[in-house]
Amino acid sequence: DYCVPAGLVAQSQAKDGTVTDLRVSDDHEVTLPMACLVNESTAGGAELFANALRKMSGANLVGTTTAGMGVLLSDPQSFSDGSAAVITVGLLLANEGETWNGAGLTPDVDAALTADEQSSYYDFTVQTDPQISRAVNAVLALVG
């Protein structure tokens, strides 16, 4: 992966307590200051990715607290009536072993939209979006 260095990205913990390391397969990362925009819709694998950027590459998370869905799901099981089901089989853990399940990831830089900004959300451009502006400022702060 070009965003994080080789190493321990996260761990999975099965219901029986067995912990398995999840690793990145290469060491070809690009070392640049980064920010990752997150909000309450950032869930599951997106939280895993955002947390890996933060922990392994020093990225700032910018936005609002994430959904807190740090769980592992089974492969879908199909049934004869056409329905399918997945079940939770474990937890995702950050590379230090803590879980964000139920709590979410707290951003390094708060970028909650005001009520006025929320009502104008679909009118924003890259140049006028206040959350993108906060993310750019976070990256500039990393550069020094």
What kind of region is each of these model predictions?
Residues 18-28, 48-56, 97-112:
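Hydrophobic transmembrane alpha-helix bundles
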Residues 26-28, 75-78, 84, 96, ...:
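Short, surface-exposed patches at the edges or C-terminal ends of soluble domains, predominantly
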Residues 56-70:
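Short, well-structured beta-strand/strand-turn elements
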Residues 2, 10-13, 33-39, 52, ...:
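Soluble periplasmic/extracytoplasmic beta-strand elements of cell-envelope proteins
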Residues 5, 96-103, 110, 115-144:
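Intrinsically disordered, Ser/Thr/Pro/Gly-rich linkers and terminal tails that flank
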Residues 1-44, 70-79, 93:
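Gly/Ser/Thr-rich loop/hinge elements
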